[in-house]
Amino acid sequence: MLAAAGLVVIGAIVIVLLLFLDSYMPHWGRSSVSQHRPVQLAIDWTAVARVSKTTATLQVVVNPLLRPGSPIHDNVFSELKDLRADYARFVPWFPYPRLGVAELEPPAHGRTSWDFRRIDPIVLDFLRATRGHPQILNFSTIPQWMWKTPSAVPVPADPDVIDFRYLRGTRLRVPIRTVAAYFRRLVSWYAAGGFRDEYGHFHRSGHHYKIKYWEVLNEMEHSLSPRVYTKLYDAIVPAIQSVSPHTRFIGLALAADVPAYFTYFLGRAKHRPNIPLDFISYHFYGGPASDETPDTWGSDTFAQANGFISKVRYVETIRKRLSPKTRTTVDEVGTILSQARTQPKPARIPDVYWNYSGALFAYVFAQLALEGIDVVGESQLVAYPGQYPSVSMVDWNTGKPNARYRVLQLLRENIPLGSRLAPPVITPGAEAGGDLFYALALHTPSRKRKLLLINKRNFKIPVWFPGLKGATVKVVDEVSAGGPPREEVLTKDEYVIPEYGVAILTLSG
């Protein structure tokens, strides 16, 4: 009797545990869609949270794969041109000093080292590919010889070598006006046909480009304090204005959203008179821990994104209080795998990673659009092993798009400026679904009703909404991969969001 009763009790416990596990299995990566009840959405198309003013764009970081003669050069710049992106950000970066620093040695004995022969081809290809659109230029590296170091910092003879050692020193060796003069000459090369060097010799370029935006430095390299950065900004800006008077300026470019930088920089009293504060910028990268799998990436990294959005709201309170006319660009957004950073031979990146990363960018973009951020830039067009390959938007072997590129393209083509944004409500009883996917309804200026759906997990999620039948779907998922988004027309009021999928549904009628 006691044994039988014990078995009954054990059986009951097992049944309860199975029911418990069944209810929570979606959070653990179960892939069977048949066991999910569709999550029901309710949309009030009149409840407009914000009219979008947010532009989705990208950054282009200079590296050897962008040089003429690179096997992927033509494909990469063709893909850049096809995006037709406003505010594309162009950043020659310090690991390639011969591709981004125009004066590698200090002037001496009547001679200078100004040399644009390797720099110009990439700059001009970028300007041609983005012609007709406002661009952001950021030559982010102050020449190393301007910094105090125990000994001279060597420059690799090979321009294609990755050299993270070039960035050294925390105190300037030269006056700030010398730094400003470097950037004045650099901009004059592209905007005013050339410049006179430190000895009065004229260097002719023949370039007369209109530089719409210039971002001053990047990520507080050299451990710049808020005060020192602001002094540099206040010297560089008028120096550039003297040769390119219509250029507007972007400040900070912070890697970490440290409030002290925003509070100091946005305080008008901290600046010289008449210094413009047109834009501020800062960055966000998420990423899973090294021991995570694709099934757990989403739960961790989307939580990181939520933390970042909370910080954005705080930064916005500072901006609105101190400098409300200053606009904002979050001009680096991406994910980084710890096993695919700067290792010369990184671990293989799973194919699903590109979808996961694209989904995170779409989510951050949508959330920042609701916050009224002006520009959101995906990072970055081209990367490769040894140089953060997990942020690349194209295949570094072919130059063809991956899913990250296609997600940006999907957002650009379907969420125009002026769209009225209305976050849907998840019906009572289905609240758990909100942690698994994201939805944003929008009414475009052309009166089309659309629904953005983002799967935060590596399993399929069914969504139900009255009126979905007849909707046209464009989705970036593992099936479409780096190809154009898949298209389908729904035959019922239900849609199953693919694993880490990003879909735009255009409703009929």
Task: Describe each PLM feature range.
Residues 330-415, 419-437:
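Aromatic/acidic polysaccharide-binding cleft in carbohydrate-active enzymes
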Residues 24-84:
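N-terminal carbohydrate-binding accessory modules
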Residues 431-469, 500-503:
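Carbohydrate-binding surface patches
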Residues 287-342, 399:
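Glycoside hydrolase catalytic-domain groove-lining segments
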Residues 1-10:
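N-terminal Sec-pathway targeting helices
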Residues 58, 126, 186, 214, ...:
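Conserved, mostly hydrophobic/aromatic
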Residues 83-301:
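Substrate-binding cleft and catalytic face of glycoside hydrolase catalytic domains
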Residues 486-509:
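C-terminal beta-strand-rich structural cap/linker in extracellular carbohydrate-active enzymes
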